Amino acid sequence: MKQQLSVILNLSLVSGFVILGVSVISPVLPQYALSFSIPVALVGWAVSAFALARVVMDIPAGFVADRFGRKKNMMFGLVLIVLSSIAAGTASNYAWLIFARIIGGIGSALYMTSAATWIAQISAGPSRGRYMSLYSGLVFAGTAFGPTIGGYTAAHFGLRAPFFAYAVFCLAGLIATLPLKEPMDSSRALGSRMSMKDVLSVLSNGPFMLVNTAVLASFFLATGVRATLVPLYASLNLGLPEEKIGILLTVAAVGTAISTFPSGWLSDKVGRKIPMMACLFLTGIASLLIPSQESVAGLMGIMAFYGLAMGLHGSIAAWPADMAPEGKLGTSMGVYRVMGDIGMVLGPITVTYVADYAGNSTVTFTPFLVPAVIVFAVGLLMIKAKDPAARRHAEEFMAE
């Protein structure tokens, strides 16, 4: 038990370092992209290039892990992130920035897919929601401190500095990964080696894919609103500097970190569906409220509300893990990562195109409306979703 917890903590902390690095650049990435004299519509690609690479690599990352082992997969991924962060920080044009972001996304896919699968493997059972929300909570803790660090670094050392900070954090994560030992029972826990037949089998599993639409919608809103529209709105509409934008994003991330673990505990008691539906509806409401805020205090209050609401999906990875077809956990977690990353790709691109189409020099209400409508619609779809954790809890209650 202690060894299991130590592995989960290690994977969670290193994942937190990786996400800390991602969030360090979040307050400055839209403005950094604009510094290359591009239209607002192309800003979304600078944010989404990272996730687009992850979409392409999430499932192949599972094949690579089967061939070389999860630990080697994770370490190589961290090396790629370090190198790509340095490349982004030294970019001389927009194309080079996009290239660096793509390489970083490949590295992230190699690391995060293996880490999520490893944790899902060793946390099977009635406590899965709590263990996976511990992982999510530490990951979100990384997002809590990153924006403030990034905003401060950019304000004092320039827009390029956060990318070098990103490299340092991932280098620390690489060092922390060295003591981990590859699990000896991975093939038994995950089933046979991943194959395209397995991938197609998982993709054709209707109940599993329905649950993953909630994953896609949640990440669509998170990257479209928090990572893209909020920095642009704060900068273009309210004229806030990078430091204050970083604080706004930190407030949201702290709220998420606070509510994530209680949400995981709750999901083990009442099932995954109720917390996830609450997350979708409440974050949609928050998205609609953001563009009505004309003061820093008001926007900060809405971001705190948004963060607490987003944390309700603390067991977001546990639900797909519960629904994974027998013997296909590794493949299922790869598909789960793909669905989340598709949301991460589409969110920024969609909202910035909508914002650019409006033709204003500021961010209007319409770009915030689009992700809100999507999460509301998907939230209603979840009424039909299966929830094994809720069924298990009901059976245990009846047995008592």
Pin down the residues of each PLM region:
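Juxtamembrane intracellular "pre-TM" segments in multi-pass secondary transporters
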Residues: 1-4, 182-212, 398-400
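Short amphipathic helix-loop junctions that connect adjacent transmembrane helices
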Residues: 28-40, 228-243
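Helix-breaking motifs and short loop linkers at transmembrane-helix boundaries and internal kinks
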Residues: 69, 90-96, 239, 271, ...
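Structural signature of the two symmetry-related core transmembrane helices
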Residues: 72-86, 167, 274-289
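Paired small-residue
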Residues: 84, 95-103, 286, 297-305
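A membrane-interface helix-boundary motif in multi-pass transporters
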Residues: 155-167, 355-373
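C-terminal membrane-cytosol helix-exit motif in multi-pass small-molecule transporters
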Residues: 168-186, 378-386
